Amino acid sequence: MFRGASAINLDTKGRIAIPKRYREPLRAEYNGQLVITVDFQSSCLLLYPLDEWSKIEAKLLLLSDTRASERAMKRLLLGYAHECELDGNGRLLLPPPLRQYANLEKHAMLVGQLNKFELWDEAAWQQQIEQSRETIRSEEFASNERLADFSL
């Protein structure tokens, strides 16, 4: 399970170094194999261990190719999907189209989301945090039935 937010940098070749605390679990449980794709709702990337990505692909397989919205989602998620493996130094190479989609240049945030990571441009992450705070303070959040019984 992945949690926490880590500030990371892209090198001149477009590689990121996965924080050390995640490297061994990724290698031990997933052989260091990941799939990187885009988030169709936000300007960030999603990094899934290959086994977790296989579950997503199984769900995508059930979607229609004739319904425009389902086809659009499949196009984005599968079209951008890039399989990769941690190198000996715990780095991943981000292909240029993925870097462009998320506006990644130098400073980024790797954010654990239990079964996956989100990879954000650092400035975009800060904006997202502010938007999330506003959402939490909104009436819509307060009236969400699924969150009514959620407590910390």
Swiss-Prot record:
* Transmembrane domains' residue ranges: none
Domain (SpoVT-AbrB): residue spans on this chain: 5-52, 81-124
Q: Which family does it belong to?
A: Belongs to the MraZ family.
Q: What is one cellular component GO term in this UniProt entry?
A: nucleoid
Q: Which PROSITE patterns match?
A: SPOVT_ABRB
Protein name as it appears in the record: Transcriptional regulator MraZ
Per the record, the major location class is cytoplasm
Presence of keyword Transcription: yes
Give the residue range of the signal peptide.
none
One GO MF term: transcription cis-regulatory region binding
What subcellular locations does the record give?
Cytoplasm, Nucleoid
HAMAP family from the UniProt entry: MraZ
> Which keywords accompany this UniProt record?
Cytoplasm, DNA-binding, Repeat, Transcription, Transcription regulation
Q: Which InterPro entries match?
A: MraZ (IPR003444), MraZ_C (IPR035644), MraZ_dom (IPR020603), MraZ_N (IPR035642), MraZ_sf (IPR038619), SpoVT-AbrB_dom (IPR007159), SpoVT-AbrB_sf (IPR037914)
Gene for this chain: mraZ
User: Which GO terms are recorded in the biological process aspect for this UniProt protein?
Assistant: negative regulation of DNA-templated transcription initiation
